[in-house]
């Protein structure tokens, strides 16, 4: 059944069958994110909202660490399944699951050990320290659960088990939504309560994911007895996983940089940007879901050397993703004030947040090009292209644009920097993709 999906099913249908569950899980996660932001803002404490916004990049960092073995492992497994090397795929799966657990425990220990220094780097000051520290502590304690969850959620999709991958995300998000108000208000935990609910949701999701791999999968395993992988295979995983991780690390870096630039204009600007970025995630993560949801399809057909089907997959992916990005941009720009008002009904927050949201949205269509291109690089094992794109949009290109635009246009320059970075990165992605397709054509001739 899974082979039919990857090899014979019509491209739009196969792509959507794999991508829609990912998108739906993203939407559920977004609903949680919005509810989380709503409950935090409902406290009415501007310093609390700003404190959580300053520490929010840490959650993205956890996902980045999880991507090392989550996306790196799933890329390797997809290609192995396409090459009909099921036993090698099983070994790779077991290795990635156990190493991600150990890695997560190490990260938790490091984050707790260097808490004071890291909070300082995040830009936490005396006004926000109480709330930021409370939120950070629980996120650090639960880092292992967040990092580990990225592994099984990604590898399940390589076997076509996208629904099971989605279910874990939904279960975790529902737990978050239920316990958010209980911890924040019922137990009077405030910022710490929001983090506690997040960690609890991830723990429950992890339990489900392990069950799904053990009971639903036919070609994957959690058994430590299958952990025998070669150094070459580990290198293959890391060559894709590290660039994939850098993508999210750069997002964390971007958020920290932006917050630090905005701090000079007041905590109200940081609070407004925190809300705007959360809302911006609605479109961004849906686009991410559609881009990376089809990644197993790309990897499988690349491994199977089915050039014709691979080209059809990419054509559909680019056209669909870019059209969706443009639609989201139009809708978000029109309704920006009303959306921001839902979270915090303060005139200055609404005005600043709406402007920030619009500037963030301008580059969505261009971001779509970068997303699909990054997905392809990871799926086909092109570590060089994946690395370049991972350090561009919210890394090297963004930093250069941010410094130039902020010096020339001040506050407005800070806000428009991401959109400018999106355009430049899309051009870089186009060049990389042309080289990949040319190489693929020459290889198959």
Task: Identify the function of each model-found stretch.
Residues 1-19, 77-144, 186-242, 298-363, ...:
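Short alpha-helical transmembrane segments in multi-pass integral membrane proteins
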Residues 7-38, 42-43, 57-72, 76, ...:
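N-terminal transmembrane alpha-helices
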Residues 17-36, 138, 172, 201-205, ...:
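Transmembrane helical elements of multi-pass membrane transporters/channels
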Residues 27, 31-49, 119-126, 182-189, ...:
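Helix-terminus/linker motif at the lipid-water interface of multi-pass membrane proteins
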Residues 28, 32, 62-66, 106, ...:
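Residue-level hotspots within pore-lining transmembrane alpha-helices
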Residues 49-109, 146-165, 259, 272-336, ...:
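Small-residue-rich hydrophobic transmembrane alpha-helices
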Residues 61-64, 176-181, 206-210, 282-285, ...:
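Hydrophobic transmembrane alpha-helices of multi-pass small-molecule transporters
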Residues 139-157, 165-173, 194-207, 288-291, ...:
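Short runs within selected transmembrane alpha-helices of multi-pass transporters and secretion channels
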């Amino acid at each position: 059944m899974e082979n039919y999906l990857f090899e014979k099913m019509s491209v739009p249908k196969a792509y959507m069958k794999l991508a829609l569950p990912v998108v739906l899980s993203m939407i559920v996660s977004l609903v949680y994110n919005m509810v989380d932001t709503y409950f935090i803002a409902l406290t009415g404490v501007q310093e609390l909202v700003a404190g959580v916004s300053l520490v929010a990049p840490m959650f993205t960092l956890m996902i980045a660490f999880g991507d090392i073995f989550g996306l790196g492992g799933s890329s390797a497994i997809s290609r192995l399944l396409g090459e009909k090397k099921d036993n090698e795929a099983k070994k790779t799966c077991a290795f990635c699951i156990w190493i991600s657990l150990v890695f997560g425990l190490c990260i938790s220990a490091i984050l707790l050990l260097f808490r004071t220094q890291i909070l300082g780097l995040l830009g936490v000051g005396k006004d926000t320290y109480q709330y930021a520290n409370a939120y950070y502590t629980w996120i650090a304690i639960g880092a292992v659960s967040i990092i580990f969850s990225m592994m099984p959620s990604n590898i399940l999709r390589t076997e076509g088990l996208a629904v099971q991958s989605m279910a874990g995300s939904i279960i975790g998000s529902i737990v978050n939504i239920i316990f958010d108000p209980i911890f924040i208000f019922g137990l009077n935990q405030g910022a710490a309560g929001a983090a506690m609910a997040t960690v609890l949701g991830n723990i429950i999701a992890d339990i489900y994911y392990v069950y799904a791999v053990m009971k639903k999968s036919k070609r994957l395993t959690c058994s430590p007895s299958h952990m025998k992988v070669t150094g070459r295979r580990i290198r293959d995983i890391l060559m894709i996983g590290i660039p994939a991780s850098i993508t999210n690390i750069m997002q964390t870096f971007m958020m920290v940089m932006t917050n630090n630039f905005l701090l000079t204009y007041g905590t109200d600007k940081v609070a407004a940007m925190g809300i705007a970025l959360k809302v911006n995630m609605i479109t961004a993560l849906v686009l991410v879901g559609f881009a990376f949801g089809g990644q197993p399809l790309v990897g499988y057909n690349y491994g199977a050397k089915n050039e014709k089907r691979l080209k059809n997959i990419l054509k559909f992916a680019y056209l669909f993703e870019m059209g969706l990005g443009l639609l989201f941009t139009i809708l978000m720009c029109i309704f920006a004030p009303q959306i921001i008002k839902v979270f915090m009904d303060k005139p200055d927050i609404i005005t600043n947040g709406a402007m920030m949201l619009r500037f963030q949205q301008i580059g969505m269509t261009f971001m779509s090009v970068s997303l699909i291109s990054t997905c392809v690089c990871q799926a086909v094992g092109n570590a060089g292209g994946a690395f370049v794109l991972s350090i561009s949009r919210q890394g090297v290109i963004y930093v250069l644009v941010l410094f130039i635009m902020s010096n020339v246009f001040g506050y407005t320059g800070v806000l428009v920097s991401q959109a400018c970075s999106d355009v430049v990165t899309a051009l870089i992605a186009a060049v990389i993709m042309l080289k990949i397709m040319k190489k693929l054509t020459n290889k198959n001739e």
